[in-house]
């Protein structure tokens, strides 16, 4: 009987519960970078003396590449970045808040269809012919470069798949799969120069976004991780500021696809 009690006690000491076996009550934070792709978009501009739409506009992101700006607090908004803080409400589900700092740059010098009217047509090197014009910089520059800020809340599920790879100790190395959905506001700083007006570049709540994601999480030594995500979503901005006058505005909606890689930590308080 004494031997049995000793054996049981020894097994308890030798096989403590792993930190990675349960997630409920844990906090996490991560910081990383992203690349984006965007669908074509119709952009509607309106003001006191103009009201026109340009169709099937294409755009690209503006990556910084590998750079120390990702680590410089004074310059962290220059690259395309992701910041997220979350809390596990169960072993599998967590809620989080975050900012996806994307960048959106309209391609200039491309021929597009348009409709509507604006003053002094033909004087901005846009060469309007029929229902087409050229997106010359004298006519329009349009960027959400500081940035296309998606401030959002997500609910995500996390599942440990380490057993599929026969990993012996998840407290040393663990692989998780994660998926989630999100909703939030668009708070862009839109850099616009329109019809010869002064450039405008100020933060403004412009609309909303919806998103869904799937990703892989690689956790090392309990507390540190690398996370990769593929996130897609829909953005609808119906109140984009384009000049210092509140009479001037734009609206657009489009789909986006983000590729994210981030580093972070997970802990209990």
Over which residues does each language-model region extend?
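Short glycine/proline- and aromatic-enriched beta-strand/turn motifs that initiate or cap beta-hairpins
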Residues: 9-87, 188-190, 258-268
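Extracellular loop and loop/strand-boundary signature of outer-membrane beta-barrel proteins
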Residues: 15-17, 68-71, 137-143, 194-203, ...
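Gram-negative (and chloroplast) outer-membrane scaffold detector with strong preference
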Residues: 18, 22-25, 84-192, 264-267
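Residues that define the transmembrane beta-barrel architecture of outer-membrane proteins
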Residues: 23-27, 77-81, 145-151, 173-175, ...
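Outer-membrane beta-barrel translocator domains and adjoining extracellular loop/strand segments
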Residues: 41-47, 108-114, 167-168, 188-198, ...
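Predominantly the C-terminal beta-signal and adjacent terminal strand-loop region
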Residues: 41-44, 50-51, 215, 219-269
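Flexible, solvent-exposed coil segments and beta strand-coil junctions
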Residues: 57-66, 128-137, 189-197, 242-245
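Membrane-embedded beta-strands of outer-membrane beta-barrel proteins
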Residues: 83, 153-155, 210-214, 230, ...
């Amino acid at each position: 009987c004494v031997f049995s009690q000793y054996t049981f006690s020894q097994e308890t000491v030798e096989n403590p519960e792993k930190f990675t076996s349960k997630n409920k009550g844990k906090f996490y934070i991560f910081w990383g970078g992203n690349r984006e792709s965007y669908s074509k978009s119709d952009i509607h501009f309106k003001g006191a003396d103009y009201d026109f739409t340009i169709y099937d506009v294409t755009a690209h992101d503006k990556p910084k590449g590998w750079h120390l700006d990702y680590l410089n607090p004074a310059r962290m908004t220059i690259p395309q970045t992701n910041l997220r803080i979350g809390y596990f409400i169960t072993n599998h589900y967590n809620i989080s808040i975050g900012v996806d700092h994307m960048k959106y740059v309209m391609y200039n010098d491309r021929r597009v269809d348009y409709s509507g009217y604006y003053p002094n047509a033909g004087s901005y090197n846009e060469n309007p012919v029929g229902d087409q014009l050229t997106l010359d910089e004298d006519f329009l520059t349009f960027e959400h470069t500081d940035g296309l800020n998606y401030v959002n809340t997500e609910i995500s599920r996390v599942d440990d798949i380490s057993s599929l790879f026969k990993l012996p100790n998840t407290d040393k190395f663990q692989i998780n799969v994660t998926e989630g959905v999100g909703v939030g506001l668009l708070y862009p700083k839109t850099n616009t120069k329109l019809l010869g007006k002064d450039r405008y570049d100020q933060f403004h709540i412009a609309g909303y976004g919806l998103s869904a994601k799937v990703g892989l999480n690689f956790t090392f030594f309990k507390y540190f991780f690398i996370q990769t995500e593929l996130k897609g979503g829909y953005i609808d901005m119906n109140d984009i500021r384009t000049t210092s006058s509140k009479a001037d505005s734009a609206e657009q909606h489009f789909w986006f696809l983000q590729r994210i890689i981030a580093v972070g930590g997970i802990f209990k308080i």
